[in-house]
């Protein structure tokens, strides 16, 4: 009886110890979790604090930059800003003009910079002979405009300027050079005809200011006979030195012999394809001697 009681007491004692140990382990686990929770919270709080600090720093830098920009433009009026941008545009145009003059220096177009822009010189030539030169004084403003020039009044300068000066200065100069160079070439031919072949003309050479309409009477002496021809040359294209329309007729109402008609047609073709002075030179080379009886 006593042994049974002892065993029961021992069992209860061991069971109580084990239960107590389990309770202690549970309490320790709960205590550890409670200790870890504040540590995690502290870490999160530190991270949040660091992010806020970085945010405030970035905001401060942005405000400083905005303040510097505002300070730099505080004393600049809108008109001044516009003037600055226009000045930059004009400077770029000036640089472009330098490049254009450099590219055209071998074509007869040259120039120099002035206090207000650039003065362009357009030199003309024909068959290797240097002829007249003209100038155009351009003012580099917005819009670009011509201050002075020596272009003849019968050259359509205003029309050319209206088309190209504001949009394509390079093309404006090229087109103007074409007109001036062709005019000088036509004038050179007419002058040569009058100076070198005046003795072979019947009456004066008639021409207009542009030298794009010429009419004259000349003689050749085929087969010992003298017969005058009347020539009319029209240059519809003012940028060319050869006529677009040529008419050669006989003077009088008499019908031409067949040989003279052939010569008349051949002369028309020559006037279409050669400068005036070269046409008369070719007559001599082919044995078509001009009527020397007209020389006085």
UniProtKB/Swiss-Prot annotation:
Cellular component terms per the entry's GO annotation: Mis6-Sim4 complex; nucleus
A single GO BP: centromere complex assembly
Record carries keyword Coiled coil: yes
Recorded coiled-coil stretches: 17-105
Record bears the keyword Coiled coil: yes
Domain of life of the native organism: Eukaryota
Keywords annotated in UniProt: Centromere, Chromosome, Coiled coil, Kinetochore, Nucleus
Family annotation (CDD domains): DRWD-C_CENP-O, DRWD-N_CENP-O
Family that this chain belongs to: Belongs to the CENP-O/MCM21 family.
Stated name of the protein: Centromere protein O
Gene: CENPO
